[in-house]
Amino acid sequence: MSYGWYHGNITRSKAEDLLSQAGKDGSYLVRDSESVCRAYALCVLNQNCVHTYRILQNAEHQLSVQASEGVPMRFFTNLVELIEFYRRENVGLVTHLQYPIEKEEEGPEEPDEEQEPAPPNVPPRNFAFTPPSETKECQTAIERAPAANASLLLSETLLQRFQDTDSRCIPEEHLQAICDYFSLHIVSDCDMVRTGSQTLPQFKKLLMTLCTGLHRELTRTLPTLESLQVAIDPQLSPGFKQRSPLPGDSATNNMVNKLTHLTSMVSNLEEKVKTVLMEGAAVKHRRSLIPPIIFEVKADSIGISQKTHLKVDVETGKLIIKKSKDGPDDKFYPSKKILQLIKSQKFPHKLVIVLETEKEKTQRKEYVFADSKKREGFCQLLQQMKNKHSGQSEPDMLSIFIGTWNMGDAPPPKNITPWFQCKGQGKTRDDTADYIEHDIYVIGTQEDPLSEKEWTDTLIHSLREITSVEYKVITTQTLWNIRIVVLAKPEHAHRISHVCTNSVKTGIANTLGNKGAVGASFMFNGTSFGFINSHLTSGSEKKLRRNQNYFNILRFLVLGDKKLSPFNFTHRFNHLFWLGDLNYRLQLPNTEAENIIQKIKQQQHQELLPHDQLNLERRESLIFFQFHEEEITFPPTYRYERGSRERYCYTKQKATGIKYNLPSWCDRILWKSYPQMHILCQSYGCTDDITTSDHSPVFGTFQVGVTSQFVSKNNPGDSGDLEAQGHIELMNCKATLYTKSHTKFYIEFHSPCLENMVKSSEAEDQEGNNGTLVVKFGVLPKLTPIISDLEYLLDQHLLICIKSSDTDESYGEGCIALRKEDTEQQFPFCTILTHHGEETGLFCGEICLPASGGKQREKLYDFVKIEKDETVAQKQLKHPYSQSMEQSRIMKSISEKSAMIARMRAAPETQNSMDHTASVAAISSQAKQSPPTTPPGFRGSEPRQKPGSPVQGRGDTPITSPPRTTLSTQKFSHSNTNRTAPAARPQDSLQITVPSDPHEMVDNPLYGPVNNTLYPPTA
């Protein structure tokens, strides 16, 4: 479809932006519907409001504009006919169609700078051969038979093809033999074929020349293997060895037979050895157990610091206190007596251990470790001990390893275990934590040259080497050379279900798989996980295209519960991890390359990170909105000289000149979790001894909270009484939407604690002002949970989706945690609304939980706490939500919204992780910049000004953005930070192919069966 007014699958907010920029009543465009497959949406501007009409297709493929009840339907054969009809006045629309909004023309797609041409650009070898035209044999053949011209052409073609191949690994004598065949002897074989012969004597002669060494080795190796096989399997018949030897002639068939025999023998031999080993006495390796580990600490007693030793015996479940390392045990505490570990925030070496004494009283013991890494290792071992001896049948906490590595199209080295042990630079694990294996490993690779089997075998072997655990492959997904592998401990296999995989191409024309993403998702008991491994467009100047890659992946990757498909992708999982070669670069002039190198050598990473494109884009909330990233304390992972980590190669000779690749943090790990879900990043760094690629592997480890399938302790007979079950009530709810649309709204509620989706009635009242619409909802339906136990409900979340009554399209989705900080039954809430990764508004109100029995159980991850320090807290960034809400309160001029924000700030949703943004300092000693006023990745919900738009569009209130001090020198000048809304960003990549794999989505039993009546039928 090539009509200028048809914009394909652009988002609703993008359509509103385009109409706002036009600013004329009667402006219109057509886009794909976001709610109904194979339907369209006609968007019309009238009096600064956007009206959207759904265009449906019936069984006869006729099109019609969805009309109100009682209005006759008009049918059209195509969109052009429909548009021409509604260009007339007074035919049913709010205004007639006058000014089509033409689709933005996209520039030609440039090949990716890292995409190597195929075949490899290897200069041809100078072969010594005699051209066919100079040989008497060929001259004679040409003179005698005109048909030999075809043989000559074939000879030249094959010879040219062979010259274009990479022949660096071929021996000289083999090169000469192949060239002689192509230039001389192939003509003889051609003559044989034309005369009806079934043999190729010259080609067989060539094969035997090339395989002389192979034949000799086969003759020598077979008897040895046969003897070994007899030793392993003595039941073989005595005549076995006499049957194996084959005639010693040099025929091709003989060699093929020997190869077949050798292949069969090696395969059978390996299986027999496995059987012998499995039947032998299985002795579990000591590495599968955690040995007792001793920490040297200082104990504060009455103001006196004394050296002492803490011995952690995970296997026996004891914490032993000793005065000397090799001395006797002075006192020990079983795991049940260790109540709490409290980390000091002000002093990173200090730890308080809360113990239960004999008289059921508590005692606090304060210790100072050698460094913060030792303290963290001690806490992880104690946490492991508590988990091991808790007596719980199901875990409520997992340890997850996330790894990403651009392999650079090179095979990995033999030893990659430092990657999985988090050895290298950055926030790494202490040596004492080496014995703690992770529950789940998620490995993402880019430019991976290995097959799936080769790579998974390598991973399993490496993990077995360091843990002695035979990890189970849960799933793999590969898009060309982008791959994700998920492995888990064998004991977790039955807890993992609903595994999904999918991929999205974002490469050249969005069809080639050279760039894109692969994803995997699954349920772990009652908790949903999603993982995305992406390889985005490269090139420092292609930041906008990378941003578009991100939105395409977010919009078109199909994973998770299919009943949550109306929701933003980031709302479909309790925990979502995004990893890969994101390819965001340092936004600095190429002339600063050497200064950058010096800053890296001096480990002054915090002076470079403010210029990181990903941080800059997240600070403006243009991408990865509400995602988190651990503080980066490791050097840039790209572009190294292969074989070493001592030197960055920041220049590359191209046909157009020298190309600069400044050292950059291309390889990243980010995450987003539901509010009040426990997640803690325990390490984030890169290796420094895996050098086969120009990228360094990056690792991250996470402690993640999970929920189990809940079993109510109440009388099962009570569950039939709905009144006794109790309800979840939402009251005084308002939604503030950043939209110019003129429509009515309703809410859909989704949750694992609800049997089915619940739909509200239309909102009672709404008012708009400057592209912001405040929608007030009256009495909302009471939500009946499947289980009313408070212990169960406090682990649940409520997903809300605000939809248009006219088109059933979403205007924003949010997540509300039912866990609260106090004991009040009724408490306020406020959640940010997003759609397709962009912020679209706020939803605030009050929620009341049923006053049923039960209380919240202490979670194992609550065993380790952080003692807050006010002086430290003041130096750190404010909480992302409170920071965002504070900006909203300042920026918004609407009194109702200010009241809602103030109420939200009284009870913020807390997170376990916080974005870290270092103090901004320029590379040059003369250039200084103040710390940013907002953390990266979070923007207040203030309306955003769109310059050049004659109509006040979505969020066009003329308000100045928060002040930011800029760099004082031109060579470090930033790009303009007063950006437009994300929806108005230039689309610099072609339309993406929408995945058509609905089978990848699954029914989640926690949500009940899919109700097909929720969605209109498609033609």
UniProtKB/Swiss-Prot annotation:
The modification Phosphotyrosine is found at Y1007. InterPro entries: Endo/exonu/phosph_ase_sf, IPPc, SH2, SH2_dom_sf. Phosphatidylinositol (PtdIns) phosphatase that specifically hydrolyzes the 5-phosphate of phosphatidylinositol-3,4,5-trisphosphate (PtdIns(3,4,5)P3) to produce PtdIns(3,4)P2, thereby negatively regulating the PI3K (phosphoinositide 3-kinase) pathways. Able also to hydrolyzes the 5-phosphate of phosphatidylinositol-4,5-bisphosphate (PtdIns(4,5)P3) and inositol 1,3,4,5-tetrakisphosphate. Acts as a negative regulator of B-cell antigen receptor signaling. Pfam families: C2_SHIP1-2_2nd (PF24147), C2_SHIP1-2_first (PF24150), Exo_endo_phos2 (PF22669), SH2 (PF00017). Signal peptide: none annotated. Belongs to the inositol 1,4,5-trisphosphate 5-phosphatase family. It comes from the Eukaryota. It catalyses: a 1,2-diacyl-sn-glycero-3-phospho-(1D-myo-inositol-3,4,5-trisphosphate) + H2O = a 1,2-diacyl-sn-glycero-3-phospho-(1D-myo-inositol-3,4-bisphosphate) + phosphate; 1D-myo-inositol 1,3,4,5-tetrakisphosphate + H2O = 1D-myo-inositol 1,3,4-trisphosphate + phosphate; a 1,2-diacyl-sn-glycero-3-phospho-(1D-myo-inositol-4,5-bisphosphate) + H2O = a 1,2-diacyl-sn-glycero-3-phospho-(1D-myo-inositol 4-phosphate) + phosphate. Tyrosine phosphorylated by the members of the SRC family after exposure to a diverse array of extracellular stimuli. Residues 909-931, 958-980, 1010-1019 have a biased composition (Polar residues). Its EC number is 3.1.3.86, 3.1.3.56, 3.1.3.36. It is a peripheral membrane protein. GO terms for biological process: immune system process; negative regulation of bone resorption; negative regulation of neutrophil differentiation; negative regulation of signal transduction; phosphatidylinositol dephosphorylation; positive regulation of B cell differentiation; regulation of immune response. GO terms for molecular function: inositol-1,3,4,5-tetrakisphosphate 5-phosphatase activity; phosphatidylinositol-3,4,5-trisphosphate 5-phosphatase activity; phosphatidylinositol-4,5-bisphosphate 5-phosphatase activity; SH3 domain binding. Residues 103-116 have a biased composition (Acidic residues). The gene is inpp5d. This is Phosphatidylinositol 3,4,5-trisphosphate 5-phosphatase 1. Gene3D superfamilies: Endonuclease/exonuclease/phosphatase (3.60.10.10), SH2 domain (3.30.505.10). PANTHER family: PHOSPHATIDYLINOSITOL 3,4,5-TRISPHOSPHATE 5-PHOSPHATASE 1, SH2 DOMAIN-CONTAINING PROTEIN.
